[in-house]
Amino acid sequence: MSVATPRAFVVGHPIAHSRSPLIHGHWLAVHGIPGSYERLDVPPAAFPDFVRGLPDSGFRGGNVTIPHKEAAFALADTLTPRARAIGAVNTLVVGPDGRIRGDNTDAPGFCAHLDHSLGAAWPERAGGTALVLGAGGAARAVVVGLAERGLRRVWVANRTAARAEAVAALAPGVGAALAWDDLPAALPGTGLLVNTTSLGMKGQPPLAVDLSPLPADAAVADIVYAPLETALLAAARRRGLAAVDGLGMLLHQAVPGFEAWFGPRPRVTPELRDRIVADLAG
């Protein structure tokens, strides 16, 4: 392989489950780029040396997944404002000077998926109010993304109040913590409900939330994509609500990284989505 051949990676531990090589491999083929995108299984103890060695590795950068996102945040030479706000990095870019920039593309990826699924006017259609369930890393990205898109109020509900408060604080003046028991009272004023928990994922119990108090024009999004149709989304469709599955977030968050490493800005197309859906089904 030529030294000039662009190379990127996804690093995690474990990593065999990652669909990122399928996504980036598809785009490399579409754009006729003779590059590579590789899975790298790096345990936590070896991750600092891995990052420090990137400038001499031949890689232009790569994606970072569980359990390394917080470590990547600490090890990057520079951080985008979004990554700094979220406190985690999922994208590394090695600059011409060898300095490593850390970014978080989960926030714009989530919002780009909403644009694609609901139309660009979804913040106005939501009445400027969203309710985010969960307070983990995905919730942090979603809350920051929603605040960036101009929502006036983003409620964060979690069974542990302190965690909800910490995530809500990422969006000063916009975010606010909500006690889990207060969900029924908050739903009538919610234009967008987002599940960022693992509830509903294959092997996990379903998320038990009664959607009947939601307005008739509300939208429900779930970041879970295995299965694509969670019990939450099925319940939303039965009520006639707009339902947004989690696969699009995975696809759209990959766009900025590909552009940084390989040049062209790729498109998320039905063909790409169908390819990943088929892989999930297999």
From Swiss-Prot:
* Residues that bind shikimate: 18-20, 65, 90, 106, 225
Catalytic reaction equation(s)? shikimate + NADP(+) = 3-dehydroshikimate + NADPH + H(+)
EC identifiers of the protein: 1.1.1.25
Enumerate the SUPFAM superfamilies for this protein: Aminoacid dehydrogenase-like, N-terminal domain, NAD(P)-binding Rossmann-fold domains
* Molecular function terms from GO: NADP binding; shikimate 3-dehydrogenase (NADP+) activity
The residues that the entry says bind NADP(+) are 134-138, 158-163, 223, 246
Statement: the UniProt record of this protein carries the keyword Amino-acid biosynthesis = yes
The catalytic site is made up of 69 (proton acceptor)
Name the family.
Belongs to the shikimate dehydrogenase family.
Record HAMAP family: Shikimate_DH_AroE (MF_00222)
- Protein name, UniProt field: Shikimate dehydrogenase (NADP(+))
> Species lineage, top-down?
Bacteria, Pseudomonadati, Pseudomonadota, Alphaproteobacteria, Hyphomicrobiales
